[in-house]
């Protein structure tokens, strides 16, 4: 179940009349061997490509650490759609409650209607949202979710009339309120 209009969570993309904009994850890296194997499969499927950009650390302008950065094509949300193929993913559904009943999990939507019973539950929501869903079935996990550190990432999507004349395509602020 995904409360958004489509699958993806943090790899969300938005379409505007002018361009598609990745507002969640702008790119990702793959260092773990098993994950790299999955990435290779996604590349072969045509879902991923290398991001040919070397971000700069700002304001110094030095190149960021060299590493392979990957993007989904044509937008980041394409990876979520690819992973969801063949699955029963229900979008636009907000889960309100998860309860344990005997050997199964019962899930209700925001209106209190049953979404069914399941053998297992996997939560990918940010910790503050997961905390409220975990409060009844696992107070211990709910308490851990409250303590989980959150590291926000700001993304700005701009569509300009003319390209900016900058010496870099992407930047990582190293000081100030965003650094």
What role is predicted for each listed range?
Residues 91-106:
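A conserved short coil-to-beta-strand element within the FAD-binding core of flavoproteins
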Residues 27-33, 48, 52, 56-84:
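Short beta-strand to alpha-helix junction loop
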Residues 2, 28, 83, 122-124, ...:
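Generic structural signal for small/hydrophobic residues in well-ordered secondary structure
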Residues 15-40:
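N-terminal glycine-rich dinucleotide-binding loop that anchors FAD/FMN and/or NAD(P) in oxidoreductases
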Residues 8, 114-176:
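Central helical "cap/lid" subdomain
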Residues 35, 97, 128-131:
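Glycine-rich nucleotide phosphate-binding loop and flanking beta-alpha elements
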């Amino acid at each position: 179940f995904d409360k958004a209009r489509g699958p993806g969570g943090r790899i969300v993309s938005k379409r505007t009349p002018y361009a598609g904009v990745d507002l969640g994850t702008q790119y990702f890296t793959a260092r773990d061997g098993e994950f790299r194997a999955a990435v290779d499969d996604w590349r072969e499927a045509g879902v991923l490509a290398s991001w040919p950009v070397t971000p700069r650390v700002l304001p110094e302008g030095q190149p960021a650490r060299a590493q392979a950065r990957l993007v989904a094509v044509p937008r980041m949300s394409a990876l979520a759609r690819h992973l969801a193929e063949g699955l029963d993913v229900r979008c636009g559904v907000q889960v309100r409650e998860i309860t344990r009943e005997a050997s199964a999990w019962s899930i209700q939507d925001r209106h209190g209607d049953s979404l069914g019973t399941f053998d297992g539950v996997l939560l990918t929501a940010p910790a503050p949202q997961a905390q409220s869903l975990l409060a009844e079935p696992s107070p211990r996990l709910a308490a851990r979710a409250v303590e989980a550190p959150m590291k926000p990432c700001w993304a700005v999507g701009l569509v300009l009339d003319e390209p900016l004349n900058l010496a870099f395509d992407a930047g990582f602020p190293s000081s100030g309120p965003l650094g």
